[in-house]
Amino acid sequence: MSAGSHESVTVARTPSPRRDAAIGGIGGLAGGLLGVGGGFVLVPLQVLWAHRDQHRAIGTSLTAILPIAIVAAATYYFGSSAPQADLPVAFFLALGGVFGALLGALASRRISDRALKVLVAILLVGAGLKELFDALVGTAPHLVGAAVPMFGPKDYALIAAGGLVIGVVSGLTGVGGGILVVPLLVLGFGVGQRIAQGTSLIAILPTAAIGALTHQRSGNVDLRAASWMAAGGVPAALLGSALALWLPARALGGLFGVFLLVAATRMWPTREQARPNLGTNG
């Protein structure tokens, strides 16, 4: 084997429950605090720290995300005097998102995702700067009020369509749906920051479950590692979501704005990357 081919092979490190639990803890804290599930953190940490290949890291991440997102979503919904999540909105987002992710995954072999990644990165920068500006000014509706606007059938149809588009983008590019759901609800529909994050956590569950099953059937899941990641991620997600309920809305919006800018830098294509089937769900 030549030196060049040797360098292209990813060799997994010796399994370490402590390392996987730490990875899960970091992802769970970020996912609970920001309402995005945690895949945005779990996947790169597995690749860099545990030396798992990209596909296996994504499949393992999706499996670990399920209990992490469930606990975080339950905290948003039950951990406050009023539920910080909207179930009808989550349902229509998930309905569109599941079909969109499947369509995106099917089309991913025939469509180049480079231009789409550039477009998504630009949108994330715009949304991140808007969140930061709103946090500094402090008068934006989603940071002042906590209520969900009164939605009618047309609004729910638009929300489902938004979920469909997000699902397609997720399936084509691998960007987690939660990263896009929160800005859609906050900036597109005027939903409060906290409620948008709690709703996002509920909405990504069906897509994460389908993605986890798909990767498991393909042999891209390390169940032992996923279990340890969930063990570290669940209590951290509980802490992160509790912090989200405690922080002022302006601070939470500012944090999410910074997160979107960081996500945009990761989204910008710098080289040919392997695409996951159903995204990483945040």
Task: Identify the meaning behind each predicted range.
Residues M1-L29, L48-W49, Q54-R56, A74-V168, ...:
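Juxtamembrane transmembrane-helix boundary motif
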Residues F40-V41, T63-A64, I179-L180, I202-A203, ...:
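Hydrophobic alpha-helical transmembrane segments of integral membrane proteins
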Residues V43-P44, P67, V182-P183, P206, ...:
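Proline-centered helix-kink/hinge sites
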Residues T63-A72, A107, I202-A209, P235-A236:
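Membrane-embedded alpha-helical segments of transport systems
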